[in-house]
Amino acid sequence: MQEIYRFIDDAIEADRQRYTDIADQIWDHPETRFEEFWSAEHLASALESAGFTVTRNVGNIPNAFIASFGQGKPVIALLGEYDALAGLSQQAGCAQPTSVTPGENGHGCGHNLLGTAAFAAAIAVKKWLEQYGQGGTVRFYGCPGEEGGSGKTFMVREGVFDDVDAALTWHPEAFAGMFNTRTLANIQASWRFKGIAAHAANSPHLGRSALDAVTLMTTGTNFLNEHIIEKARVHYAITNSGGISPNVVQAQAEVLYLIRAPEMTDVQHIYDRVAKIAEGAALMTETTVECRFDKACSSYLPNRTLENAMYQALSHFGTPEWNSEELAFAKQIQATLTSNDRQNSLNNIAATGGENGKVFALRHRETVLANEVAPYAATDNVLAASTDVGDVSWKLPVAQCFSPCFAVGTPLHTWQLVSQGRTSIAHKGMLLAAKTMAATTVNLFLDSGLLQECQQEHQQVTDTQPYHCPIPKNVTPSPLK
């Protein structure tokens, strides 16, 4: 493996500036779910220029694509994302909340880094395949709409991963370690009520309030929370209250629900009960109700064999060396965080490493930027979050790591993260992830026994728990409204 590590390290460092430029350019063009046309084409055309064969409009999603190089088996996929979040515009390298354009988008989850690291890994693996004449195929999967859109779930449904043997990805974090926990499955759907408008004082008896129906539905689901499993979550947002005039009986209103639980069967059960509450609310108010299924994703299925192989590569490369300017800026960011933010970050570290992870987290209570790789241990912990990587993981072996791109304590989906996402701190973490994925991919090409063991582990689970795509066939991806 030492020769592989040297080759990958040299290959990625040789193009270091190119990769940081691409990450920054995507940061400069933040686009939300299923509207990432600039970002997708930027990556696709760059891969095309690098000698990859690019297929666009994959899975009937205009900004999803596959870039492929090589021939035959095995086929190893590197999963890239590039979507941003609404309302998180923020100036880069600034330790106070200062938007570039108020109310506009920002890369609050570091997906400008996520997609670029997978891009860099794919280029490095291509160079290795060319250098050594090794058989096999490396693919970059351009996956839009992770944030609230479950883009990969739609892609899985359309069969675009059917011939893939294994997949690797990563996520920007405040520490270096493995993403080795289960996640929550979810369903997101909206209920739109229609009633009859009327003068709220003169003729309220003639009106039928859609807003009342939404209020009754939210009240009912809040009572339902007492009667669902402990690890389930039911979130909602009233996306249309009917208007701003209280003297009108509101003729339309809408509420969006996100239902989560460790298993999709539990999510589906809760979803069915919420749907009945909606019907009851419509009945009580003499309104009509229409449900629009938005998206869903499955829980994440870890593959311990592949995780171990990826962890070996991550441990070899180790955490980046930070300079005094980076440490000083990270301290400024930490000064804006709460003690709860910091503790939550440490809890996330601890959750991935068993008992050693807890000791590791305690040791790093005062750490500014991660300076060692967190321990790895197979764990039954469930991360209280969701990812559409979950659906890929039920189709084939998947492993993913975390890489340090932010100050310890930085919460996801915040201005602090956006600010750090276009700095040398983020760039260093991104390139560590790229090297880790590339080296693990080469290892899979060379070690057929390793790949077979990964697939056997995967099959042992899916033989007894077969995968069913949670998104109905008639549902199509929808941009953020």
Swiss-Prot record:
SUPFAM superfamilies reported in the protein's UniProt record: Bacterial exopeptidase dimerisation domain, Zn-dependent exopeptidases
Required cofactor names: Mn(2+)
Induction comment: Could be transcriptionally regulated by AbgR.
Keyword Hydrolase: yes
InterPro entries in the record: Amidohydrolase, Aminobenzoyl-glu_utiliz_pB, Bact_exopeptidase_dim_dom, Peptidase_M20, Peptidase_M20/M20A_hydrolases, Peptidase_M20_dimer
One GO cellular component term: catalytic complex
Keyword Manganese listed: no
E.C. number(s) listed in UniProt: 3.5.1.-
A Gene Ontology biological process term: folic acid catabolic process
Any GO molecular function: para-aminobenzoyl-glutamate hydrolase activity
Keywords: Hydrolase
Gene3D superfamilies to which the protein is assigned, alphabetical: 3.30.70.360, Zn peptidases
Broad EC category: hydrolase
PANTHER family: PEPTIDASE M20 (PTHR30575), XAA-ARG DIPEPTIDASE (PTHR30575:SF0)
Purpose: Component of the p-aminobenzoyl-glutamate hydrolase multicomponent enzyme system which catalyzes the cleavage of p-aminobenzoyl-glutamate (PABA-GLU) to form p-aminobenzoate (PABA) and glutamate. AbgAB does not degrade dipeptides and the physiological role of abgABT should be clarified.
Subunit architecture: Forms a heterodimer with AbgA.
Name recorded for this polypeptide: p-aminobenzoyl-glutamate hydrolase subunit B
Gene: abgB
